Amino acid sequence: MRRGPRVALVLGLLRIYLAQANFAPHFFDNGVGSTNGNMALFSLPEDTPVGSHVYTLNGTDPEGDPISYHISFDPSTRSVFSVDPNFGNITLVEELDREREDEIEAIISISDGLNLVAEKVVILVTDANDEAPRFIQEPYIIRVPENIPAGSSIFKVQAEDKDTGSGGSVTYSLQNLHSSKFSMDRHSGVLRLQAGATLDYEKSRAHYITVIAKDGGGRLRGADMVFSATTTVTINVEDVQDTAPIFVGTPYYGYVYEDTLPGSEVLTVVAIDGDRGKPNHILYRLLNESDGIFEINETSGAISVLQSPALLRREVYELHVQVTEVNSPGSPAAQATVPVTIRIVDLNNHPPTFYGESGPQNKFELSMFEHPPQGEILRGLKITVNDSDQGANAKFNLRLVGPGGIFRVVPQTVLNEAQVTIIVENSAAIDFEKSKLLTFKLLAIEVNTPEKFSSTADIVIQLLDTNDNVPKFTSHYYIARIPENAPGGSNVVAVTAVDPDTGPWGKVHYSIYGTGSDLFLIHPSTGLIYTQPWASLDAEGTSRYNFYVKAEDMDGRYSLAEVFVTLLDVNDHYPQFVQSVQEKTMVLGTPLKIEATDQDAEEPNNLVDYSITRAEPVNVFDIDAHTGEIRLKNSIRSLEALHNITPSGDYSWSLQVQAKDRGSPSFSTTALLKIDITDTERLSRGSMAAFLIQTKDNPMKAVGVLAGVMAIVVAITVLISTATFWRNKKSNKVLPVRRVLRRRPSPAPHTVRIEWLKFRRAKAATKFILKEDSPNENCNNSRVGVMVPPRAPALPPPPKMASSMVAQQTVPTVSGSLTPQPSPQLPTPKTLGGPVQSSLVSELKQKFEKKSLDNKAYI
């Protein structure tokens, strides 16, 4: 029952680890007019047919994993697009209408199965000429006095077109071209009485004029379309009466476009005499000062602009025009005033522009330390953005284009001008070791204009390093092997740690410590480990060392690695004969065995081969080269055969045996073995000797007999002790018995000088004749005094001899001797010719030599 949650927890942790090790996919940025990328700066005409393929999302995954695309919309809005998750093809599924919705917000995302990256995009809906002009404030019925001056403004019609650009610009014209009394300004829609034309109340009290409003045309579904609308203006002619001047066509609104030339006429104020009789002349003048920007014609009432509108800072100017009737002298002049509103119409002819401290600038650079605090402002960037247009034409958005989520820009929407502030969003992503240079584009794009003017500025951030990294070894452990006879100061292994930081922070200092580091040193700068100058390595004493190395930077940040050093055995020991026996007796058909040991640590240096180097006579004995067993030749099957081999006819033999190891160079030792040969019939004279000979091939029988004897001795001892105890108890006296056991001192070793003996005829029991410093028949004093080659420190004493070997030593008839004689040639110690090859160091698999590690623990 408990295994399920544990498995789920392990799978969850594994999934988190894999997600952290997996880098997120990202979109490709697209430029203006591109239909492939992340939909930045993407716009779509409103007349695009439903079902059209309008865009292709395009991105990539750093690991090359399969990616999928998605698009979503706010629940309160329409789902205008659909996307193919595999290929990123975006299809229009809802009809567009710019007049109702001029931009569409959507969230596009890209996923590699583990990571999901989402971006919010704004798709701009561009205009198509799908709207016709529409007259406002209909019907148009006006009253005009009959004495209105020729060229005067009579009325102003107004039509609007919801389209933008040329499709939203309206021009006016008259349909009844046969009528020559009236004309219309094609841009302003002002209806005027043509020059030279007059109105006559008596002849015609009303005039009907058809006005056509036509847009500038535009593209609609692939074709050029022009829409128009018509209306009728009814002009009722009034009889002139004796009244004050009357303004015609009020209210007065004038529009001056930004590209209008100085001196151009803006509008005409028309005032007439209200009298029905003979009209008086009207004079016009401006009551308020216009700062020299506008002037009015005294007689016609035409208002003109004197300065370039592009230089004007105000958007609206309010003027007051006064008209005065020119009467006969002495008559009071009738006057009237009217307000005139003139609006400066801004043309969207300025894109947003970035400014630095010295003027317009499209590249801004900054140096800063890595990992700044979250929310910190990049105060080194002095950026101002400005759009010289007015009103809606000067409204634009700001955004950063580049690696997402690192910085954000404030403000995001600007009207005319703003100071740009860039704030840190993701401090961890600002990493000197990952990227020394961060590059972004600061994008300013207009919001509510059909042109969508935009500009960009490059933001280049040069990162400065800080000590934010720990030195790391290239491996968690290092393994080296060096010969045991390497001289002091020999190179062992070079460890390497890397600190990604730069300058002093990236310098690594190495040190060494641990229980196995006494014999080693490390170079603090290079990481080279070498032996102490006085170090003497011995594989037979300690063959393996392990210790730790430390890599530390100047601020104390450090990491550790473990070093394993294995000493390679060198053949620096002679074989040594184990048994110190002078004589032996060989029973016909039973081999003798000699044994020598080599204290080298590894094969083949400690493997010993045996051979007979000298014998008199020859061709009597054979020796097994691997086990050291000595046998008679197969042709010798009886004592009589032996008796006839030599002139002396005896059964005593002398052999010189050599023990030679398999190392390179090879060392050897010789020993002299004296053998008496007998048979089982002669051994039957001694019961103990016969028993030992019989049980030689069955040692368990000897052990059983020995155990029985010991049991009997113990039983007798217990009985005697019990009887003594009860006797003393009856006499109320217990006498302690104290036995002092002393170990017999071992006899001092002495040198035995053995001469080669001539064989002579004797009885079978006759011994060899020896010449020695002090005659001794039972001790091994046959060691020849020659110089011993240098060798490693002594190993612990060898294990005790097996019981079978002891049994052989106790045979009463043993009369042979074994005399080790080392080879006169001394070994030449091996030295390292150079540093240990790095290929040996890199053999990491040596750490896993489990068989060796299980058998030999590190010291």
Swiss-Prot record:
Signal peptide span: 1-21
Record note on modification: Undergoes proteolytic cleavage; produces a soluble 95 kDa N-terminal fragment and a 25 kDa cell-associated C-terminal fragment.
Cytoplasmic side: 723-859
Localization terms from the record: Cell membrane
Molecular function as annotated in GO: calcium ion binding
Region (Disordered): 793-838
Glycan attachment residues as annotated in the record: N58, N89, N288
Disruption phenotype: Mice have no obvious phenotype but show photoreceptor cell death as early as 1 month of age shortly after completion of retinal development. Its absence severely compromises the structure of OS which are disorganized and fragmented, but the consequences on photoreceptor electrical signaling are very mild. Proteolytic cleavage is partially inhibited in the absence of orderly OS assembly in mouse retinas lacking RDS/peripherin.
Membrane topology, from the record: Single-pass membrane protein
Cellular component, GO, one term: photoreceptor outer segment membrane
InterPro entries, per database record: Cadherin, Cadherin-like_dom, Cadherin-like_sf, Cadherin_CS
Keywords, comma-separated and alphabetical: Calcium, Cell adhesion, Cell membrane, Glycoprotein, Membrane, Receptor, Repeat, Signal, Transmembrane, Transmembrane helix
Polar residues bias locations: 805-816
CDD domains: Cadherin_repeat (cd11304)
Pfam family, one: Cadherin
Segments passing through the bilayer: 702-722
Domain Cadherin: 36-135, 136-247, 248-354, 360-473, 474-577, 569-691
Function: Potential calcium-dependent cell-adhesion protein. May be required for the structural integrity of the outer segment (OS) of photoreceptor cells.
Subunit description: Interacts with PROM1.
Protein name (Swiss-Prot/TrEMBL): Cadherin-related family member 1
Gene responsible for this protein: Cdhr1
